[in-house]
Protein backbone atom coordinates (compact mmCIF):
# COMPACT_ATOMS: atom_id res chain seq x y z
CA UNK A 1 0.00 0.00 0.00
CA UNK A 2 1.40 3.37 -1.01
CA UNK A 3 1.58 6.35 1.26
CA UNK A 4 -0.98 9.00 0.25
CA UNK A 5 1.86 11.41 -0.51
CA UNK A 6 3.47 8.95 -2.93
CA UNK A 7 0.40 8.46 -5.10
CA UNK A 8 1.11 9.43 -8.69
CA UNK A 9 4.85 9.59 -8.04
CA UNK A 10 5.91 6.38 -9.72
CA UNK A 11 9.59 6.06 -10.58
CA UNK A 12 10.45 7.47 -14.00
CA UNK A 13 13.41 9.08 -15.76
CA UNK A 14 12.49 12.50 -14.37
CA UNK A 15 12.58 11.54 -10.69
CA UNK A 16 14.56 8.32 -10.34
CA UNK A 17 17.90 7.04 -11.56
CA UNK A 18 19.22 3.72 -10.26
CA UNK A 19 22.86 4.18 -9.30
CA UNK A 20 25.78 1.91 -8.56
CA UNK A 21 28.71 3.42 -6.64
CA UNK A 22 30.49 4.01 -9.94
CA UNK A 23 27.57 5.68 -11.68
CA UNK A 24 26.92 7.66 -8.47
CA UNK A 25 30.32 9.37 -8.49
CA UNK A 26 30.21 9.97 -12.25
CA UNK A 27 26.73 11.49 -12.10
CA UNK A 28 27.49 13.54 -8.99
CA UNK A 29 30.65 14.98 -10.58
CA UNK A 30 28.54 15.98 -13.58
CA UNK A 31 25.61 17.48 -11.64
CA UNK A 32 27.46 18.98 -8.65
CA UNK A 33 31.04 19.51 -9.92
CA UNK A 34 31.90 22.37 -7.55
CA UNK A 35 30.28 21.03 -4.39
CA UNK A 36 32.54 19.71 -1.66
CA UNK A 37 32.88 15.93 -1.70
CA UNK A 38 35.73 15.28 0.73
CA UNK A 39 37.11 17.20 3.70
CA UNK A 40 40.21 15.78 5.37
CA UNK A 41 42.09 18.15 7.67
CA UNK A 42 42.98 21.17 5.57
CA UNK A 43 42.35 19.34 2.29
CA UNK A 44 39.07 19.78 0.43
CA UNK A 45 38.07 18.19 -2.85
CA UNK A 46 35.05 18.91 -5.00
CA UNK A 47 33.11 16.12 -6.67
CA UNK A 48 34.79 16.91 -9.99
CA UNK A 49 38.26 16.86 -8.41
CA UNK A 50 37.49 13.59 -6.64
CA UNK A 51 36.17 12.00 -9.83
CA UNK A 52 39.22 13.23 -11.76
CA UNK A 53 41.53 11.71 -9.14
CA UNK A 54 39.57 8.43 -9.28
CA UNK A 55 39.97 8.28 -13.07
CA UNK A 56 43.68 9.11 -12.76
CA UNK A 57 44.17 6.26 -10.25
CA UNK A 58 42.29 3.85 -12.51
CA UNK A 59 44.45 4.88 -15.45
CA UNK A 60 47.67 4.39 -13.47
CA UNK A 61 46.55 0.95 -12.29
CA UNK A 62 45.62 -0.03 -15.85
CA UNK A 63 49.06 1.10 -17.01
CA UNK A 64 50.50 -1.39 -14.51
CA UNK A 65 48.41 -4.23 -15.89
CA UNK A 66 45.57 -4.21 -13.35
CA UNK A 67 42.25 -5.17 -14.89
CA UNK A 68 39.05 -7.13 -14.59
CA UNK A 69 39.21 -9.92 -12.03
CA UNK A 70 42.43 -8.72 -10.38
CA UNK A 71 42.64 -7.96 -6.66
CA UNK A 72 44.29 -4.79 -5.40
CA UNK A 73 45.28 -4.59 -1.72
CA UNK A 74 45.48 -1.14 -0.14
CA UNK A 75 46.90 -0.45 3.31
CA UNK A 76 45.91 3.12 4.03
CA UNK A 77 44.49 5.21 6.80
CA UNK A 78 41.02 6.68 6.33
CA UNK A 79 42.18 9.36 3.87
CA UNK A 80 40.99 10.81 0.57
CA UNK A 81 43.33 8.36 -1.16
CA UNK A 82 41.39 5.44 0.34
CA UNK A 83 38.14 6.92 -0.98
CA UNK A 84 39.76 7.14 -4.40
CA UNK A 85 40.74 3.46 -4.15
CA UNK A 86 37.14 2.50 -3.32
CA UNK A 87 36.03 3.98 -6.64
CA UNK A 88 39.15 3.74 -8.83
CA UNK A 89 39.80 0.02 -8.44
CA UNK A 90 36.25 -1.11 -9.33
CA UNK A 91 36.30 1.15 -12.41
CA UNK A 92 38.68 -1.43 -13.89
CA UNK A 93 36.54 -4.37 -12.81
CA UNK A 94 39.12 -5.23 -10.15
CA UNK A 95 38.41 -5.99 -6.49
CA UNK A 96 39.69 -3.79 -3.66
CA UNK A 97 41.05 -5.60 -0.60
CA UNK A 98 41.35 -2.98 2.13
CA UNK A 99 43.76 -3.57 4.98
CA UNK A 100 42.74 -1.54 8.01
CA UNK A 101 45.73 0.11 9.68
CA UNK A 102 43.73 0.66 12.88
CA UNK A 103 43.25 -3.02 13.71
CA UNK A 104 45.71 -4.96 15.83
CA UNK A 105 47.28 -8.09 14.37
What is each model feature region?
Residues 93:
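Structured binding elements
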Residues 99-101:
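Short beta->alpha connector loops at strand-helix junctions that form conserved
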Residues 1-18:
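Flexible, non-catalytic linker and terminal segments flanking ANL/adenylate-forming cores
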Residues 16-17, 26, 34-79, 83-87, ...:
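Conserved AMP-binding/adenylate-forming core of the ANL superfamily
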